[in-house]
Amino acid sequence: MYASKLKKGDEIRIVSPATSMSILSNEAKIQAKTALERLGYRVTIAEHANECNEFDSSSIESRVHDLHAAFFDPGVKAILTTLGGFNSNQLLRYLDYEKIKRHPKILCGYSDITALCNAIYQKTGLVTYSGPHFSTFAMKKGLDYTEEYFLSCCASDDPFEIHPSSEWSDDRWFLDQENRRFYPNNGPVVIQEGYAEGTLIGGNLCTLNLLQGTEYFPETEHTILLIEDDYMSDIHMFDRDLQSLIHLPAFSHVKAILIGRFQKASNVSIDLVKAMIETKKELSGIPIIANINAGHTSPIATFPIGGTCRIEAISGTSRIWIDKH
């Protein structure tokens, strides 16, 4: 099930299912709102988005209320999460999935929002989106690529190919917008060759793993698995988190793996990724592409969780298409 695509003049509701909006500077809030308005949308803020407790979040009741209010408001056409965090999985048993299913909306975010995106897809069949947060749109430089693929996925029905960005960044742009550091992007790296087509699931690896053994973990039959993690995940952590997924009985149905670019502080090189994959006989024969524009570096593409993805990795070159989103 796909929600209606965004059109100019539509309302986007900003909700904080994990970290509170209050940690953003006023300048960042204004910049992000202005960027979305420049794209032609109206921006409204959820009632409790700025609530903040000792966990830099708000109560479960407040966050569930805001998500329900956004989904059930007929004027709202899309929901953007403020940013990630650690606790959106607290909300899963309190969401009214049947009612969400009757009021499908675009839901977009990444990192900790992976729990919501995959759970809602699994419980309702509604395709959700691993893509920019509201806070991402506060970026003054280097936002064009992220905007382009957000619109391709959320404002159009047309199939599209995800091309690599010309450059990428891993700086703390939210602390210094003027002195950005960008690197040339060498593009995706083929770890294992092959062709695959399937339903896209996943997102942030350590957050996806929180859903294991629950009713919220997505079905893996005929799927392409998207995984990425932040600077706190070194190769040892990423290795064991991936191995945990591989041990799932249904993992054998996964047709391919896409791995997002690692942050520099993780110290994970492509050679380490290749060496890690070589240890996993369970992955033999499926295409694997690493260093794609997904995750905690910028820019990022938007990926439909529950949509249809097609990949080709042949002779050291790769292509990624999003056919249904």
Curated annotation (Swiss-Prot):
The gene is yocD. InterPro entries: Carboxypeptidase_A_C_sf, Class_I_gatase-like, LdcA_N, Peptidase_S66_N, Peptidase_S66C, S66_fam. The active site is at S111 (nucleophile), E228 (charge relay system), H296 (charge relay system). GO terms for biological process: proteolysis. One of its GO terms (molecular function) is serine-type peptidase activity. Gene3D superfamilies: Class I glutamine amidotransferase-like, LD-carboxypeptidase A C-terminal domain-like. It comes from the Bacteria. This is Putative carboxypeptidase YocD. Belongs to the peptidase S66 family. Keywords: Carboxypeptidase, Hydrolase, Protease, Serine protease. It comes from Bacillus subtilis (strain 168). Coiled coil: none annotated. The keyword Protease applies. Its EC number is 3.4.16.-. One of its GO terms (cellular component) is cytosol.
